Amino acid sequence: PALGFSVTSGMPLDYFPVLLGVGILMGLCGVLFCRMIFAFKRFFEWMKCSRFLKLVITFVTVAVIGFDSQLLLGGGNDLVGQLAFQSHGVLLLGGIVLGKILLTTFCYGSGAQGGIFLPMLVIGASAGAFCESLLSSMGLIAPDFVPQFVLCAMGGMLAAAMRTPILAILLVLEMTDSFSNIYAIGIVTIVAYLVAELLKEPPIYDSLLQAMTGQSNLENVQTFFQTKVPVVASYVDTQLQDLNLPEGTLIVSIRRNGTYIVPLNDVKLQ
């Protein structure tokens, strides 16, 4: 496996309701991660200093943090395996989640070279281990399913940030060769995806591409179509000016009893 570990045992069905909460948490983490990246980008743009000075500030910050918190440094591929098979305290895991989000977004926002895919996996793994440790300390679950929670949370984090739930599931399954957990990962991934959709956070890679090119990846395309007004429609006998049409929508012609009517604002649909 690409991440160096595999989980062959699945999660009991009794724990599946708990995964809904994990999915909500991962959706929030994904949205926070995306927004923090652009918050730090705006911060460094506001500083109006040279790129060299920005990198110096980033290096000094990372160096100071690294003296005390080595777990937050680097990509974190070794950390994922440690989180899955070693026991850690709730406070430490929560600190890793928040610290990794802040440090990764800070470095990326400064313009320093580095990716965000592997850090997203580490954030997800840390959040999954945090959820398992918290729930087991409260006596809600048995303390034997850390790897399963790590897998589920990684899928949720990718789905929330990238907005590709199916791809997120496949990536986690293939990188860990843990196909026995496909249903558990699917639940967390879909819930996290829905949370990010409800919060209207665009996919991180689409947003980064738009920021780099200065162009939106969505193009306005002119489309014509015809439709009939059902007799039982709620908007029958409603004036055109009172219709709640989507932005950019224009009614160009109305055909009634074989004749065409100019679509003025006071014309009623029949």
Residue positions per predicted region:
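Alpha-helical transmembrane segments and immediately membrane-proximal extracytoplasmic
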Residues: 1-216
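Detector for Asparagine
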Residues: 77, 181, 217-220, 244, ...
